[in-house]
Amino acid sequence: MISAASEAVSGNPAPFTWVTGVSMLVFCAILWVIVDYMRTHPRPSMWVWGLALLTFPLWIWGPGRDIGLINWFSWAKILSVLIPLTLVGAMRIAAAEQREGRIWELLRNPRFLWFPYAILFLNIAEATLRDAETGNYWNAAVGLGLCLTIPYCPRFWEVLPGRNAELVAYTTMAWNFLYTTWNLCFTFGGYPPQEEHFAASICILAVAEIYPLVKRRPELYIMARIYTLPVLMLVIAIYNIFPKVMPSDGWFDNDVWIVWGIVNFALTVPYLFWYTWQLETGRAFIHFRRGHAREDFVRQHGDTVEQLMALSDSLDATADTHGRSTRSSTR
């Protein structure tokens, strides 16, 4: 049963006004500064979000408790963002300062990159369950597709050497777009009126999309995303001002919500096939990377990747329609 229409709309339209527009621009500017600061300062990227957990009494007993974390999803979201983000900060410190010790060495191990991968998977899965709970099964299917197409670790993730120790993930432009439109559709119908923040979600997703483009480093998308989301969740948890300063409650339309999910699903299906083909042929090594990251990778590993791609093409060419090798391939 579709329940978002009854849960997400108070019945009082909230038109887009100049106050909403200015509030969104100011929020975007604040998010931009936070993302840029966190990207270049590994230590604060751990301590700020770790200490933010100490505000939890306000989540439970504060003046905004009735308009903040009022359902299981919001509680799961804030905890699955702040706690892991603190550990990601420790990973960056371990790489930036090259500290000694077993724990620091573990945090620097490339295989530990499976941790942020798993957290991203978890965050998408949480929203996917919420989509299914509210009745938008099309958009829930998109969430599942996004989980399945997160680029693998540590092949397409790394913490770059240097004092900034940036966490980068080589996601594709199509994946970023699908994630953005899926998340917006989810936020459009996934929250009750006292907790709604669709306009604010537009801000955090817009900054995550635009920041890497301005920096001409597409691999910073995940990093920008992980540092915009906790800001949103903390505001909601402590005192949710979004329904007042940038109201969007009355924007909801049930038909738009469902059609939006269907369109997202239609875009996801071909991407799943393309993503699988990229991995199978070895083209993902190059095509998932863009800009300078691709140039650097090709310069270091281009010959090896070409050999892998040639091997994949030759294996496809020497197999008959029944999957058996031809005579020439067995000599």
Predicted regions: what they are:
Residues 1-17:
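Short, strongly hydrophobic alpha-helical membrane anchors
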Residues 50-67, 88-91, 116-132, 173-189, ...:
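Hydrophobic alpha-helical transmembrane segments and adjacent interfacial helices
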Residues 68-76, 133-140, 250-260:
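Non-cytosolic membrane-interface motifs at loop->transmembrane helix junctions
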Residues 21-31, 77-95, 115-123, 142-155, ...:
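Hydrophobic cores of alpha-helical transmembrane segments in multi-pass inner/ER membrane proteins
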Residues 102-219, 225:
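Generic multipass alpha-helical transmembrane bundles of integral membrane proteins
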Residues 24-33, 197-317:
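C-terminal transmembrane-bundle signature of multipass membrane proteins
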Residues 16-36, 48-96:
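Transmembrane-helix bundle segments that line or gate the permeation/cavity pathway
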